[in-house]
Amino acid sequence: MPKKIDTEPLYDGDGPSPQEIKMNAGFQYELDLIKKLREEGFTVSDPAGADSAKADLELTPTYKNQIIKFELKEKLSADFAQMNFDFDTSSMQFTIDKNKASAQKEAAKTMIGIAESYGIIREANSHWQPQKNIPAKFTLSSSSSLDQRKAAHKLDLKRFPDKFLAKGSAAAQEVEKYYNSKNTYYIQVKGKGLFYMGRDPEGYGCPRFSSSVRESSIRIRIKTNSSSNARWSFLMAIKITGLGKSSHDLDKDANFLLKPGL
């Protein structure tokens, strides 16, 4: 089907100089934590790297011959997960091209997984009604002038308002469901510690992730990447703020991994 692909990179945050999200963001944190745990005698698999089938950290405990998976976050970015919408010019609806370069980043893969389970693309098409209001961004050609692009940007900002699809702890719970579908029930955030997602199958006694955030939301919006160069995207993103500190932290004392529930 004919498509207009949004080739804009994914950026962490707004403002005049947002930083592009790198393909290997957080990889050094994976390496450092794996090294630390191995030095402490834990059996840990090699880093996941680009292997999306593996968790960031996979540990085999001494008390059972079964891998325990952990998601690792070096930081809570401005957008926990995000992905730019593309546009299907035959059906005149927003869509997602999973094969484009930006879709291969972890922030995008997480967002796509949540989008599919939550129906975010359907919600975006229902809210924005692109069949009636064709996004000006996707009518531009490669030869469009800067003035034409600026006019299109201004028009899209006027016609496509933001919408929040989940607030409170609901978005954080969607994050938990996504990782649970990958058999991952724990998330370690640098500087915050370890949290369980959905349930605590190992009985570590750490706090629940979705109960430890002050606010979370799923948002569809236009994100301006550069006003001066008229670069923007139609975006879906999960924002998580105010994560409290956990009583458990893999970066500090990880001995609780040896005797869970005790």
PLM feature spans:
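A short, highly charged nucleic-acid-interacting micro-segment common to nuclease
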Residues: P2-D32, P47-A50
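Catalytic cores of nucleic-acid endonucleases
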Residues: D14-I21, L31, E39, E71-L235, ...
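Rossmann-fold NAD(P)-dependent oxidoreductase module
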Residues: K36
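Active-site beta-strand-loop-beta-strand hairpin of nuclease catalytic cores
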Residues: E39-G41, G49, E58-E71, L76-D79, ...
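Beta-rich catalytic cores
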Residues: A53
